[in-house]
């Protein structure tokens, strides 16, 4: 997303850092040093779909990581399952959002994929105020949803939230046509 971790102060601490300086943690948010936890923008996490190491400096995942680290410090034994990196950006009255992997990430991983572009209205066209939006869905040959991007004036957040939920619920791309 374009940020770098400010972890230089940890270089001689014994805490393992990734090649770009991110703190390496396990799925309990613990570093390689027992009892030392890290969360947020400075850590490397697992991509939810492909289990690869990724940096996702977003508030939502950071909050979840903080709760998981606190629970583990308290002995509750919770695990972080990774992140889809779901995010939204508003530019004046237009919104752009994404979830999961984009084409560039999939190409870097050597994954084969298909892309579907659709241009629905934000809601039923017979109801006043409908506006067009563009939705791009990326999926595998067998229908696994890898990611999506959307842009428009209304309804972008709803579409991306539904798709991120579909990914976490292991729905296939063709299951989306049945969602009401």
Language-model regions: role of each:
Residues 42-154:
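Mid-to-C-terminal Rossmann-like scaffold of FAD/NAD(P)H-dependent oxidoreductases
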Residues 154-171:
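A short, polar/charged loop-to-alpha-helix boundary motif
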Residues 26, 146-150, 160-163:
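Beta-strand scaffold of nucleotide-dependent catalytic cores
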Residues 169-180:
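Cysteine/selenocysteine-centered motifs that mediate thiol-based redox chemistry or coordinate metal-sulfur cofactors
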Residues 16, 112, 172-173:
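Residue-level detector of anion-binding/catalytic polar loops
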Residues 1-68:
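FAD-site-proximal beta/loop scaffold in flavoenzymes
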Residues 60, 71, 164-165, 178:
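Generic alpha-helical structural context detector
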């Amino acid at each position: 997303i374009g940020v770098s971790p400010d972890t230089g102060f940890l270089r001689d601490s014994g805490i393992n850092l990734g090649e770009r300086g991110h703190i390496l943690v396990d799925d309990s948010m613990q570093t390689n040093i027992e009892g030392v936890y890290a969360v947020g923008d400075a850590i490397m996490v697992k991509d939810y779909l492909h289990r690869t190491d990724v940096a996702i400096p977003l508030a939502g995942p950071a909050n979840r990581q903080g709760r998981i680290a606190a629970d583990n410090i308290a002995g509750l034994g919770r695990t972080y399952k990774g992140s889809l990196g779901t995010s939204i950006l508003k530019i004046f009255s237009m919104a752009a959002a994404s979830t999961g992997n984009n084409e560039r990430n999939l190409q870097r991983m050597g994954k084969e994929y298909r892309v579907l572009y659709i241009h629905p209205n934000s809601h039923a066209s017979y109801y006043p105020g409908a506006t067009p939006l563009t939705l791009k869905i990326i999926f595998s040959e067998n229908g696994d949803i890898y990611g999506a991007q959307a842009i428009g004036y209304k309804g972008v957040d709803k579409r991306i939230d539904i798709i991120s939920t579909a990914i976490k619920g292991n729905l296939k791309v063709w299951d989306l046509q049945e969602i009401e």
